[in-house]
Amino acid sequence: MKFKLIIVMAEDGLTDQAIEIARGHGATGSTVITSARGEGLNPIQSFLGLTITGQRDMILFLVEEHRSRDILEAVSSACCFDVNPGTGVAFQIDIEDAIGLRGQIENIQQEISKEDL
């Protein structure tokens, strides 16, 4: 079974929504890293030397490759990444190998079997 890692950088107010949408589209878990920071096309403005930005979260989803594109697009659409600039970004990368996913793999295999019926 092959996996992809979906990485979502989003405003902290969108974290729960992104997780809920991803789970609804087949993600079996997530990892959230809080207080992430990024910079886009335009540098972040500062006031008296202090950077003024909202908190961002990095959300990681290790998902089965056949579901990855659907999850990626669903999260992006629900969080309006293409509609509201600066809201967040989502992308995926290939995973060479992963260990410690036995329970999730069994769950994914059962779901795939149900879909085939």
Give the role of each language-model region.
Residues 1-117:
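Positively charged, small/polar-rich N-terminal and surface patches that mediate targeting and assembly
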